[in-house]
Amino acid sequence: MRPSAIARFSSRRVERTACLAAGVFLLASGFIASALAQSAQQSQPDSGQNSQNSAQNPAQTPQKPAPVTTTVIVHGEVEDNYLPESITVGTLGGVPLKDAPLSASVMTRDLMSDQVSRLLSDVVKNDASVDDDYVPVGYYGVYEIRGFPIDLATGLEVNGLPIAGEQDVPLENKEAVEILKGIASVESGVANAGGLIDYVTKRPANIHAVDLATDQRGTAFGAADFGQLFGSQKQVGARFNLAGERIVPYMNSTNGWRAVGAGAADWKLSPKAVLRGDFEYQHKTERDGSGYQLLGGTTLPDINHIYRSTMLGDQPWGPPDTYDTFNTSARFNYALSPNWTAFAAAGLSHSLIQDNVLYVYGCYYEAECNSGAAPPYFFAPDGTYDIYDYRDPGELRIDGQAEAMLSGHIRTGVITQDVTAGGVLFLRTVHQPGAPPGDAPSTVQDGAVYSYVGSANIYQPIAALPPPGDPDSLEYPLQSAGPRALWEDDHQASAVIEDRVRIPGRIQLIAGGRYDSLRDHNYSLTATSPSTPPKISDKNPWLPQYAVTFDPKRSLTLYANYGVLLSLGPEGPFWVDNSSQFLAPFFTRQAEIGAKYEPSGRILLTTALFHMRAPFFYPKVIEAPDSFCPESVFVAPGDLCFQQEGRETHNGIELNAAGKAANWLRLNASATAMSAMSTDTGTPAFDNRQVINVPRLHSNVFADLTVPGVRGLHLMPGWSYTSRKEATRDDAVSVPSYNLLNLGARYTPGGEQGRVTFHIYANNVTNKKYWSDTGASYGDTFIWLGAPATVRLDAHYSF
């Protein structure tokens, strides 16, 4: 947790854009249809375009869809395109992606390899509905889907089980990354709206491969992928992934390194029973950089006079962050009969962080800000900012989940039903530094260390500051954090049920829901002020989810869905009267209609129209005590109080194309046009305004083009466009729109069946300088410079 979130230590014309996006999509669809027609006229079978993934897994054959799952899962082979040929994605029972009544995208292993992806931020850029929210260099990221930040407690999964999202999940052992866009109340229970991101691990196969990679800055990467199938019927398999990396980012002084170890095992105990297990561990150490803030809360820094390579507040004595994380799970599938199956699964996720950063924030120690002439929670008007020694040792977050499901197929005349029911138990705990004991020395702080050590200016060189503990330092004597204490204890017990009814006329009706018994104990205030009682959220909501699908023909699916989701209330920032207090849980509702078209079995075209509504939260100027800031916390008229008032409504259209458009073209394209408006907020300046950090239009295209006449050579151009993003709630300040061009190539000497494959991929080839994001974190807003041109090289060898 970063200090801006911590109160106690002292101190965020859709019609035209939709038409434009639709026009782009129609043009792309026309081009794809033309390419498909040309491909269909060719008499030769497509035998020379096997993907890298197929070369890596010669003995692996497409598997049957996994049985019932409580989360949206995608499993299967990737053969010759960016769309898995055999996949399951759905509500509780799992259905083919084309038939699923929801909006989802899949980033395959081929796509990740072609783009030389290392982090989730490299992957999610392929979906226009996903944006960065708070993603510092060297720190784990927070992302938003459809304009809503994901919940790090439950919004990230591995093989359908939630993990502690405060980590950079390694990609070396991942077969795919799936993104579910929109509400998934049956799957996720109590969480934030927007969607889920799920990592699918590689399964055992006969494979022996190594990778070596670098970039123009000197990053060094190596990985090994070893797998083997055993037994007369190959009923037992194991796979191991090892990786190490010396990390050299574009920002000075943020170098680091990481090591990864992962294993997976499958055991077919009998024709009816299968046991699967996974484990992954990563150790990472790296310094991270802070983002910029608006000058005086009203002005963007002059982008022509700042540098992407500058680490704000950099000092040679600044320690790095250290991460030790593991995720493990097991799953047992059993076929009770030809029509009935059951499974049980359990997972545990552990994230331990030694959080150390030279944190750059606000201008509390500048005269202009202290006088009230400028808000102290932004940079000063002249670009001056405060530097804090922030140390939060022993941040420990644990997620655990166990679930069991029973699924059956029932036929009654012309009506068939797929019924699924089961239960889920979820636990999350958070430990961080708390209040010192009564006999502790005065150097032990209440919670994390958050000490002012000096100031600097974004337009000037950073002066050297004495390290904490030095007699000349503003932090003398050296401070230490309080002992680790329990901050959050979240228990959920859920009963889930779903019935998918197929009736004549190619119509399917789906009704389901999740009864969730939530008991969330938040001790964040108690941990640092023991006399303060914990914040307890005790809810027992019924979270319904309904859908209908209609298939006019085999290749086309039309659908509609409706769902409700419960989320825990946000925490007030430290500079409001009700600082660090959590607001009440709230509901988000969604209605969505969509269409999916798969004309050839090799490419999927989808579109979705969605409407989502949630409460609006913001710091409001108040003149007298109210229900959010009663007499006990109200300080003075004109103060700010963090409140829930009004609502934000997100309406949008999503367009996607993924797969193989022709023998010479693989494609992954996405466009999202969205209006995310705040209304009835009680502050007229904030009404009918676009929500912070949500672009009205976002699009991207990535293509893999076979070069004629050069066997094994492919060119991979890419382009993305992001419209302007608002940086203030009144939309008075925004960052400009930008285009980015990417370019890559893949070469396999001797053709696609060769053992060696070389990749080169360059992001932002024009080295464009731009503001990428304006995300809000715990009520504070930050602006981030986009990354400069980065060229990555990778060599893959199979043996």
Which functions belong to the PLM regions below?
Residues 69-207, 593:
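Acidic, small-polar-rich N-terminal luminal/periplasmic segments of exported/outer-membrane proteins
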Residues 1-115, 121-129:
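N-terminal Sec signal peptide and the immediately downstream disordered periplasmic leader
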Residues 266-268, 397, 416-428, 435, ...:
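Structural signature of Gram-negative outer-membrane beta-barrels, strongest in the C-terminal barrel
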Residues 504-509, 611-613, 639-728, 796-798:
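Gram-negative outer-membrane beta-barrel transporters
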Residues 245-249, 262-268, 272-335, 339, ...:
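Acidic/polar loop-and-plug regions of large Gram-negative outer-membrane beta-barrel proteins
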Residues 173-175, 186-263, 267-274, 603:
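Outer-membrane beta-barrel translocator/receptor signature
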Residues 23, 395, 407, 419, ...:
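Conserved C-terminal beta-signal and adjacent last beta-strands/turns
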Residues 335, 341-347, 351-357, 551, ...:
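Membrane-embedded beta-barrel scaffold of Gram-negative outer-membrane proteins
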